[in-house]
C-alpha cells in the first residue's frame, strides 16, 4: 500500500485483506526505522512516531493473529548488533517494554494482569521514569566487572566493556561474592552536557548530534574507548539481568534501594502504587516537571513490584507482561514538499515518497514522509511545492496530516501524476483485489526488486555482510559486476580473473576496502539455517517465522526437500505447517508458491552449494517438554489460559491451537468441546487440569 492514514483506520472494522495490506506496509517502515535508530544512530522519526507505528502493528496482529508473520515486528526487540563490535550473548534476554499511550491502555494493562493472575485487585506497582538513553547490561563475576554490552536485538548485544569503564561513577567492583550478578540500565547525557558537546563538535567542524539520546549512543559505541572517555556520559540502573543469587531482592522497590546501597546511580524519583488513580497522577506530575529535569525522559514505566508475580506473568517474545511504558504525546510540524519520488520494494510494491525541507521535531530531523498510495495523494490534494503539516501523535510514520492551502502557490505547485508502469522496468502496474498498493509483477527481471532483494539478503538480520551497503550494491548492479545474489559469492574470483576494471582500482573502493569486503563475504558463507531462510525474502516469512521453520525442518537439506514436496501438493506437510502456531496458512501458502517457481529453486540450489548452512540448534532442547506439541482446551479453575500456556512454553513445549496428528498431549478443562472428541478419535494422550499441575510440579 502507498498510504497509511490511521485517522481513517478502524481496527474493529478492518477486513483480513485490508489488515494484511497495512501490516505489509508496516514491515517496510519499521525495518527502515530500526536500521536508522539502532545501527546508524540517525533516526528518521521520533520515538513517539515509531511507537505508534509499532502499536498499530501489534493491535492489528492481535485482531488477526494469522498476520503475525507478515512482518515480525510484533516479535522484535531492538536491532542486530553492528559487525564492528564483538558480540555478547545475553544470558537473559533484554526485552523491550510494551507501550501505552492513554489512560485506557494503562487500565487495560492492570486488567490483563488481574485476569492472568486470577485476582480482583491491583497488585502493587512501582512507578519510575523512562530514561531516554541507550540500554545496557553489565556483568559482575565474584564482584568484578567483567563484561558490558548493549541491548542489540535482545538476544545478542555489542561488547562495550572498555567503554563503560570510562564512566567514572560506574562501579568496577562490588562488595559481593556472587558468581554472576548482572545489572541493567540506561546510559544518557544530560541536556546541558549535550549542548556543550555540540558546541565542541561545531568548533571541530564535526557533525552535530540531533538529540541527547543519539549523543549517548554514539559515544558509548565508539571503537576507541579514549573517545568515549572524553564524553560526559552518565547512567541509571533499574533492573537485574542474570544472577546466581535469586534472593538478592524480592521486589522492585527493594531492588532499587539495594542497587543504590551498592553505589550504583539510581534515579530516586519512583513511587509505590496500588491503584490506577495514583499511577496516572504520577504520570501527570512527571509530565509537568519534564522540562525542568536535567535529562531526557520519554514517559514513565509501571512494573509489578513483587518478583514472584513477575515470574508468574512471564513475557511474550518481545516484552514482559509485568511492565508497561506510558509514553508522552508527540508534536506537530510544518514544512515544504520539494519533490515526490517512487520507490519499488522487494515484493514489487510501488510507494510514493514526499521529500521535505528538513524539519526538526522534538530533536529528530525529518526529511521525507511516505505517501503510501495514489489515493492519499489525490484525497488530500498533495502537490509538489505545498506546505504540509506533519502530525506525530497517534500516527505511525512522519505522516502528512494535511496541506496548508493558505500557503499554496498555484503558479508553482505541481500535481503528481501516479504512473501506470513500473518506474524501474516499465512493466504495467497492477492493484490486486482487496489492495490499494500498486505492484510490479516483473519480480525476476525488475532491477529495483532485484536490488531490494539483494539488500535484504546481505542485511544485518540476514547474512550480515558488512561493507556491502546499498550504494555499493547499486554500483555493482549498474556496472554488471553482479546480476543476482549468487554473484556476490563469486565476486572475489571474478575480480581476479574476469573483470577488466578491478574493484580496487575504482575510486572510493581501494585495495584494503575490497579485501575487507571479500573477507566479510567469505565469513558470511557460514550461516545458521533460520537466517538463511529469512534471507530468501519469502513473502510472510519474517525472522520469527524463519526460526519456526528452521526448528521444524532442522537442516537445509530437509527444508528444501520438504518445501519441494509442499510445492507438489504434499498435504501432510502443508497441514503440519499450518498447525504450527506462528506459521499458519499464510506462511505455508507463500512457502509453497515460492518453491513452485523454478528460478527460486535454482537460486537456492546454487546457494546451498556455496554456503555452509548450519543445522538448527535450539537452546531450549534440553527442557523437559522440548519438541512436545501441547494443546489446551476449555476453561481452567486454578490458572488462566494465558498462564497455563506460559507454563508449557517455559518447559520447552510448542503450544498448538488445533488438535492434529502432530499433537502430543491435550490438556482439558471445563467445557472442552470438539478438541476433546478429535483427540479421542486420534488416540492422543489426554489429561485434566489437576493432572497437568501435578505433572508440572514433578517436572
From Swiss-Prot:
Cofactor: Mg(2+); Mn(2+)
Chemical reaction(s) catalysed: NAD(+) + (deoxyribonucleotide)n-3'-hydroxyl + 5'-phospho-(deoxyribonucleotide)m = (deoxyribonucleotide)n+m + AMP + beta-nicotinamide D-nucleotide
SUPFAM superfamilies named in the record: BRCT domain, DNA ligase/mRNA capping enzyme, catalytic domain, Nucleic acid-binding proteins, RuvA domain 2-like
GO MF annotations, alphabetized: DNA binding; DNA ligase (NAD+) activity; metal ion binding
Pfam families hit by this protein: BRCT (PF00533), DNA_ligase_aden (PF01653), DNA_ligase_OB (PF03120), DNA_ligase_ZBD (PF03119), HHH_2 (PF12826)
Family indicated by similarity: Belongs to the NAD-dependent DNA ligase family. LigA subfamily.
Record keywords, A-Z: DNA damage, DNA repair, DNA replication, Ligase, Magnesium, Manganese, Metal-binding, NAD, Zinc
Record InterPro entries: BRCT_dom (IPR001357), BRCT_dom_sf (IPR036420), DisA/LigA_HHH (IPR041663), DNA_ligase (IPR001679), DNA_ligase_AS (IPR018239), DNA_ligase_CS (IPR033136), DNAligase_adenylation (IPR013839), DNAligase_N (IPR013840)
UniProt binding sites for Zn(2+): 422, 425, 440, 446
Enzyme Commission number(s) from the entry: 6.5.1.2
GO biological process, one term: DNA replication
Keyword Disulfide bond attached: no
Role played: DNA ligase that catalyzes the formation of phosphodiester linkages between 5'-phosphoryl and 3'-hydroxyl groups in double-stranded DNA using NAD as a coenzyme and as the energy source for the reaction. It is essential for DNA replication and repair of damaged DNA.
Origin organism lineage: Bacteria, Pseudomonadati, Pseudomonadota, Alphaproteobacteria, Rickettsiales
NCBIfam families in UniProt: dnlj, PRK07956.1
Domain BRCT positions: 620-699
Enzyme class name: ligase
Keyword Ribosomal protein: no
The protein's name in its UniProt record: DNA ligase
SMART domains: BRCT (SM00292), HhH1 (SM00278), LIGANc (SM00532)
Binding residue positions for NAD(+): 47-51, 96-97, 128, 151, 186, 303, 327
Stretches that traverse the bilayer: none
Active site: 130
HAMAP family: DNA_ligase_A
Amino acid at each position: 500500500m502507498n498510504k497509511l492514514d490511521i485517522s481513517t483506520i478502524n481496527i474493529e472494522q478492518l477486513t483480513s485483506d485490508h489488515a494484511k495490506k497495512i501490516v505489509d506496509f508496516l514491515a517496510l517502515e519499521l525495518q527502515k526505522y530500526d536500521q536508522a535508530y539502532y545501527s546508524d544512530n540517525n533516526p528518521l522519526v521520533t520515538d513517539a512516531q515509531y511507537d505508534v507505528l509499532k502499536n498499530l502493528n501489534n493491535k492489528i496482529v492481535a485482531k488477526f493473529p494469522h498476520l503475525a508473520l507478515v512482518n515480525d515486528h510484533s516479535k522484535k526487540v531492538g536491532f542486530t548488533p553492528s559487525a564492528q563490535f564483538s558480540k555478547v550473548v545475553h544470558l537473559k534476554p533484554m526485552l523491550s517494554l510494551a507501550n501505552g499511550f492513554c489512560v485506557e491502555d494503562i487500565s487495560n494493562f492492570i486488567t490483563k494482569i488481574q485476569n492472568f493472575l486470577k485476582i480482583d485487585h491491583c497488585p502493587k506497582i512501582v512507578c519510575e521514569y523512562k530514561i531516554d538513553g541507550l540500554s545496557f547490561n553489565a556483568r559482575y563475576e565474584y564482584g568484578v566487572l567483567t563484561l558490558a554490552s548493549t541491548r542489540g536485538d535482545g538476544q545478542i548485544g555489542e561488547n562495550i566493556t572498555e567503554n563503560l569503564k570510562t564512566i567514572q561513577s560506574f562501579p568496577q567492583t562490588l562488595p559481593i561474592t556472587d558468581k554472576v550478578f548482572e545489572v541493567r540500565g540506561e546510559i544518557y547525557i544530560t541536556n546541558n552536557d549535550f549542548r556543550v558537546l555540540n558546541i565542541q563538535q561545531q568548533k571541530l567542524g564535526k557533525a552535530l548530534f540531533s538529540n541527547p539520546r543519539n549523543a549517548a549512543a554514539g559515544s558509548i559505541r565508539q571503537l576507541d574507548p579514549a573517545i568515549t572517555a572524553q564524553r560526559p556520559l552518565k547512567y541509571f540502573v533499574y533492573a537485574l539481568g542474570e544472577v546466581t543469587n535469586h534472593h538478592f531482592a524480592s521486589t522492585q522497590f527493594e531492588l532499587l534501594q539495594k542497587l543504590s546501597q551498592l553505589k550504583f546511580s539510581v534515579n530516586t524519583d519512583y513511587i509505590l502504587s496500588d491503584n490506577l488513580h495514583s499511577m496516572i497522577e504520577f504520570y501527570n506530575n512527571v509530565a509537568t516537571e519534564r522540562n525542568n529535569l536535567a535529562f531526557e525522559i520519554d514517559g514513565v514505566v509501571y512494573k509489578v513490584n513483587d518478583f514472584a508475580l513477575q515470574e508468574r506473568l512471564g513475557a511474550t517474545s518481545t516484552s514482559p507482561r509485568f511492565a508497561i511504558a506510558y509514553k508522552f504525546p508527540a508534536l506537530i510540524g510544518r514544512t515544504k514538499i520539494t519533490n515526490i519520488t517512487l520507490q519499488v520494494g522487494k515484493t514489487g510494491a510501488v510507494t510514493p515518497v514526499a521529500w521535505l525541507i528538513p524539519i526538526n521535531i522534538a530533536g529528530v530531523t525529518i526529511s521525507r514522509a511516505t505517501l503510501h498510495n495514489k489515493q492519499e495523494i489525490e484525497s488530500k490534494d498533495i502537490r509538489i511545492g505545498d506546505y504540509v503539516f506533519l502530525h506525530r501523535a497517534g500516527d505511525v510514520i512522519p505522516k502528512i496530516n494535511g496541506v496548508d492551502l493558505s500557503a499554496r502557490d498555484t503558479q508553482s505547485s505541481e500535481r503528481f501524476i501516479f504512473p501506470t508502469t513500473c518506474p524501474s522496468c516499465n512493466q504495467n502496474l497492477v492493484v490486486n483485489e482487496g489492495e490499494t498498493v500498486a505492484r510490479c509483477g516483473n519480480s525476476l527481471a525488475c532491477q529495483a526488486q532485484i536490488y531490494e532483494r539483494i539488500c535484504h539478503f546481505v542485511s544485518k538480520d540476514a547474512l550480515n555482510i558488512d561493507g556491502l551497503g546499498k550504494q555499493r550494491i547499486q554500483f555493482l548492479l549498474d556496472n554488471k559486476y553482479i546480476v543476482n545474489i549468487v554473484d556476490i559469492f563469486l565476486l572475489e574470483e571474478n575480480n581476479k580473473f574476469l573483470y577488466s576494471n578491478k574493484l580496487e582500482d575504482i575510486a572510493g573502493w581501494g585495495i584494503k576496502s575490497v579485501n575487507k569486503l571479500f573477507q566479510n563475504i567469505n565469513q558470511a558463507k557460514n550461516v545458521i539455517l533460520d537466517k538463511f531462510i529469512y534471507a530468501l525474502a519469502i513473502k510472510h516469512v519474517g525472522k520469527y517465522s524463519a526460526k519456526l521453520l528452521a526448528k521444524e525442518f532442522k537442516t537445509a537439506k530437509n527444508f528444501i526437500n520438504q518445501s519441494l514436496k509442499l510445492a507438489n501438493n504434499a498435504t501432510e506437510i502443508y497441514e503440519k505447517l499450518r498447525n504450527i502456531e506462528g506459521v499458519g496458512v499464510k506462511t505455508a501458502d507463500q512457502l509453497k508458491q515460492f518453491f513452485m517457481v523454478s528460478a527460486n529453486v535454482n537460486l537456492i540450489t546454487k546457494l546451498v552449494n556455496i554456503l555452509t548452512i548450519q543445522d538448527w540448534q535450539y537452546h531450549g532442547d534440553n527442557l523437559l517438554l522440548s519438541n512436545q506439541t501441547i494443546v489446551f482446551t476449555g476453561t481452567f479453575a486454578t490458572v488462566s489460559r494465558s498462564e497455563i500456556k506460559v507454563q508449557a512454553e517455559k518447559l520447552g513445549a510448542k503450544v498448538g491451537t488445533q488438535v492434529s496428528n502432530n499433537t502430543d498431549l491435550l490438556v482439558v478443562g471445563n467445557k472442552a468441546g470438539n478438541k476433546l472428541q478429535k483427540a479421542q478419535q486420534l488416540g492422543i494422550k489426554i489429561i485434566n487440569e489437576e493432572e497437568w499441575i501435578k505433572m508440572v510440579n514433578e517436572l
